């Protein structure tokens, strides 16, 4: 019976994967081609469609097993993709590159969870007594929510670093139709204006990317702090000690230290924002380790 349900879940999740993939392709096409995509509502609709399927899968597991589905890596990845989808849907109208980042991340996560993760890791087993606690839902959901925010912020920081340091305006012109590419960061309209006005708009786009990255990471850092504290309380309640230095705890602490360093550099006006963005980009690698650990 369990194998049949897993096959059914895989079939349904194909729709979520395709929705995120189509959305990703449209958003990247909109950023990299001059002509405005007339069906701009389609990628956002695909994201919403994909998100509804993921939410349905989580709710189905919740009702079937009578607890919030965050007990294994598969369920955690589904929840992470749902969080990233929500963030993307909310903020894509403010900065269209968020649509490209968020939908691509969701596509990769769903693809990994359904096509690479071994079936044994997707099956749910009976929870250990220590996991039958309300702290499970609170701690894990807050941690994954924080990772979703930090992933989005770190990706934006990475783009900020690349655009400011590694690409000149001439090289960008060779890669993209420059007016459309930059203006699309801020608005969903193509522009033909060039020259000083365009350069000023480009700088505004850079600052918009960096500012949103800072806001995402700040909120994610607060959530991560709350998640670590709730996890410590849960550990003390279940096992009698607040910290045991297991891999999950260690990587969560490393993640906290990396983004604490980012915030320290970012707030200190003596440092250039580019250094803070480099640290945040490093945090993206750390999050990958802590998520898949």
From Swiss-Prot:
InterPro entries: Cyt_c_assembly (IPR002541), Cyt_c_biogenesis_CcsA (IPR017562), Cyt_c_biogenesis_CcsA/CcmC (IPR045062)
GO cellular component: chloroplast thylakoid membrane; plasma membrane
Membrane-crossing segments per the record: 12-32, 39-59, 78-98, 99-119, 142-162, 216-236, 250-267, 273-293
Keywords: Chloroplast, Cytochrome c-type biogenesis, Membrane, Plastid, Thylakoid, Transmembrane, Transmembrane helix
One example of a Gene Ontology biological process annotation: cytochrome complex assembly
GO molecular function: heme binding
Locations listed in the record: Plastid, Chloroplast thylakoid membrane
Membrane topology: Multi-pass membrane protein
Principal cellular location given in the protein's record: plastid
Family: Belongs to the CcmF/CycK/Ccl1/NrfE/CcsA family.
Subunit relationships: May interact with Ccs1.
Function: Required during biogenesis of c-type cytochromes (cytochrome c6 and cytochrome f) at the step of heme attachment.
HAMAP family: CytC_CcsA (MF_01391)
Protein name in the entry: Cytochrome c biogenesis protein CcsA
